[in-house]
Amino acid sequence: MRKIILLLFISSMSHSLSAQPTEILQGAWVREEKEKKTVILITDQLISVAAYNEKEKKFLYTWGGSYVLHEGQLQLQYEWSSNDSNLVNTSASIPFFIKGNKLSLGENLTELERGPAVPSGDLQGVWIISGTYTDGGLNKRPNPFLPRRTMKLIVGDYFQWVSYNVVTKKFFDAGGGRQTHAKGVYSEEIGYFTKATASVGKKMTFTYAIDGDDWRHSGQKSTGGQLDECWTRRRYIELQFKPGSN
């Protein structure tokens, strides 16, 4: 009887340890150097890495995609890479290590500190732009997931959006920085923006509303003019548009 209980305990511990890294990895991880800031955003589904020089308003690179964890490795399926489009639609196994409050991912991304804990907000997660609002109502795109994809991650108090084509492997643009959201007000402090470096450092405030899996994002663009966008949770978009998901 004792042997059975011991085996059940060991089995339970092994299961919890194998599941633990996924939860530990999720969040925003940051490393600040003299002229470079590296931010890794990790959800249960996606990882995004971005590096930039906020002082000089220079974007350095971004890459990322979907992932799973297996035997101490982060198995990445690249969806975008600003520096090397040949990586797109390929996979890589990247070792990771967490010690205390710091993450090391592979050989080059070391000693990133976990971002501060923030209240869980209703915008946290991964979103795909799916349409725009006009006087006539909501106009949804025929297929917001393929081949071109514009995605936004909100993790902790950081955000990143990235636009890319998963068929041609072309990277278009990206932007990111710090964010807060609560009670229908969403604010961004822009840390990098490939389209318009003049926007870096700006603090923007928008209104937002959640309707099911849709997020209505309204306000003024950092480059001027109004926006009234619909973003939809990626999981829902995948169920609708990802080949083989139905």
Model-derived features with residue positions:
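Glycine/small-residue-rich hydrophobic helix-like segments
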Residues: 182-186
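Sec-dependent N-terminal signal peptides
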Residues: 4-13
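Beta-propeller blade signature
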Residues: 177-181
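Lipid interaction determinants
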Residues: 15-174, 187-246
